[in-house]
Amino acid sequence: MNEIITARGSLLIAGVTIDGATVDIAVDEKGTIAAIGKDAKKTIDADIVIDGSDRIAVPGLVNTHTHAAMSLLRGYADDMILQDWLSQKIWPLEAHLTGDDVYAGTRFACLEMIKSGTVAFNDMYFFMDRAAAAVDDMGMRATLAYGFIDLGMEEKREAEIKATETLVAHVRSLDNPRIRVAVGPHSVYTVSPEGLRWCAEYAAEQEIGIHVHLSETEKEVVDCVARFGKRPAYLLDDCGCLTPRTVAAHCCWLDEAECRLLAERGVTASHNPASNMKLAVNRAMPYHWLKAAGANVSLGTDGCSSNNNLDLMEEMKFAALLQKFAWNSPTLLPAGEAIEMATAAGARALGTGPGTLTVGAPADIVLLDARAVCNTPLFHADSNAVYACNGGAVMTVLCQGRVLMHEREVPGEEEIVREAAAAARSLVDRAQDSS
């Protein structure tokens, strides 16, 4: 195994490129960036030295909407209408999930994210105690939420409340600064107003975040207005779910007033362009309205079953192109803003630091291959990162100063892939046997 990955202590990335300049990055033993510049090496006696020549340093990427264990469902069901896809394929299969499946799937998802430059993610799913174990093993950051779905039934709501409280207690017992917890009301169409209010009150009481799907489809909006007399964002607001700790995924069918409301409440909107296009939700997130209102807009992949990968490098390109095409504006969401969505905006949403390569920030650092075909010629690094490269250009990944991947080597990769493949096959077999 690569000894740079197994070593611990202070670290120096020597001769790396940042914004066109060749510098060193010094990382102290706490995993914090101690210095950046030509004299950075003088600030520490480095235990680990990484050769940064022919490498471009960028902040670690932050994926603000995932269902990580759904990596086991990659390619299981495609090219379907969203509600049919969920009700006929995804939900029936998920009924057979076990904690071991979620561990294997989440560990596999972490591997894929690391290999494409992601250091932190915002996850909503089930058996999240096992997801936490996978995140811990892989060395990433994550905010984990149990997917709260009560379907308007009081008995089910009580069970969801208990499951949420159990996860919060479990994550706090881990005392792991890389792993945080949130409340996860799935959506306005799967959670009753009573359930939404409980989620909001509990999140406020515990001082934790809220992770929710919002206005993904036109049907969600139409049904909400028909049932409650108001659009989904206003229903969430009435229930107390729109706060500065809230990440709202999708936001495709927001109107301009709802965009202003999210900005006023300090909500982060998570753009998931690949999933939205694949599921044909028929409208791109109104990024221009959200930005004009001052909202924080971040980037997510959604789950592997609707993307079908977790490559946030690729997602940046999808975001930029979709916005330009859908809103007929070639200047909308330029490359620099796409990178900011995938880094600093996501870090703000999850509270993982500034999401920048600056002194005092957590050493969440990605090194891209400057010699890769996608980076040749290298006129503008931001442009290449967004429009030309994908996760294959990622060579080295650090999270809080710990090397998770070096020269594309991740410890235990073959075993992780093998176990995920076996878990996926077993899950499908169990579902078929029961039908």
Language-model regions, residue ranges each:
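Metal-coordinating catalytic core of metallo-dependent amide/deamination hydrolases
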Residues: R130-C252, A257-C259
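Active-site microenvironment of metallo-dependent hydrolases
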Residues: M1-V23, V27-A34, T343-S435
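His/Asp/Glu-enriched, well-ordered alpha-helical/loop segment
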Residues: D238-R245, Y287-A372, V386-N390, L398
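Alpha-helical scaffold segments that flank or form the walls of functional sites
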Residues: R74-M140, A163-L174, A422-Q432
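Histidine/acidic-residue-rich catalytic or RNA/ligand-binding cores of hydrolases
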Residues: E218-K230, E258-A263, A280-L290, N307-K324, ...
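Active-site gating loops and adjacent loop-to-helix segments of metal-dependent hydrolytic enzymes
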Residues: L72-A104, L111, M138-M153, E158, ...
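Divalent metal-coordination and catalytic microenvironments
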Residues: V16, G31, D54, H65, ...
